[in-house]
Amino acid sequence: MEFKIMSKVDNIEQKVIKVIADNQGKKIEEISVDSRFAEDLGVDSLSTVEIMMEIEKEFGVDVPDEEATKIKKVADVVNYIKEHKS
């Protein structure tokens, strides 16, 4: 059972990284869960909004604006999805 849980988490990480890579025109290998949007990836606020809209659509979660402003790293997105995806 633990393996399935880890696979699900890894899958979430991979999908989030793919969404960001596609949005930013980057290679998947350039992005990790520790990557910071602004500092490491050069993502501006408009692109962050676009990424979060894609994340909402991809995972079927709603990310309110007040929560979205707290998201600074890829790991923040992954953790939010894990906490709010049913």
Curated annotation (Swiss-Prot):
Keywords: Cytoplasm, Fatty acid biosynthesis, Fatty acid metabolism, Lipid biosynthesis, Lipid metabolism, Phosphopantetheine, Phosphoprotein. GO terms for cellular component: cytoplasm. One of its GO terms (molecular function) is acyl binding. It comes from the Bacteria. Gene3D superfamilies: ACP-like. InterPro entries: ACP, ACP-like_sf, PP-bd_ACP. It holds the Pfam family PP-binding. The modification O-(pantetheine 4'-phosphoryl)serine is found at residue 45. Belongs to the acyl carrier protein (ACP) family. Carrier of the growing fatty acid chain in fatty acid biosynthesis. This is Acyl carrier protein. It comes from Rickettsia bellii (strain RML369-C).
